[in-house]
């Protein structure tokens, strides 16, 4: 019997773009498992797996507008692993929203990016 994976949505309810992305998916009758990653912290292994599914580096996933980034990371030559560690410690540094569909993932900026992995 084939195992069916449910889509996962890395969500921050306080973020307008994240709420808009979820509403967009629901308008397409897609109801993913919602992961409030600020409350239920993502593990390092899961974040590394997410980077692979997104096909991006940690530097590409990090939110550069956050004060934590500006005060601690900007201008430093940090490795991918060091940036992952920062995102684990400070999950608000992780760009959002993210939809995962099996082995594929997309950042919903713009929300229409999700169409690449749901159609």
Where do the PLM segments sit?
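Alpha-helical protein-protein interaction elements
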Residues: 1-2, 16, 29, 61, ...
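Local sequence-structure signature of Cys/Sec-based thiol-disulfide redox active-site neighborhoods
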Residues: 2-27, 32-37
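Thiol/selenol-based redox catalytic cores and closely related redox-interacting motifs
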Residues: 39-119
């Amino acid at each position: 019997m084939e195992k069916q994976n449910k889509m996962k949505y890395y969500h921050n309810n306080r973020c307008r773009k994240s709420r808009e992305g979820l509403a967009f998916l629901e308008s397409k009758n897609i109801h993913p498992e919602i992961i409030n990653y600020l409350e239920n912290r993502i593990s390092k292994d899961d974040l590394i797996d997410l980077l692979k599914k997104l096909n991006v580096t940690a530097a590409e996933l990090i939110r550069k507008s956050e004060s934590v980034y500006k005060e601690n990371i900007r201008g430093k030559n940090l490795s991918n692993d060091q940036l992952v560690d920062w995102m684990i410690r400070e999950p608000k540094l992780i760009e959002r929203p993210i939809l995962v569909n099996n082995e594929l993932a997309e950042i919903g900026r713009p929300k229409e990016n999700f169409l690449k992995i749901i159609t």
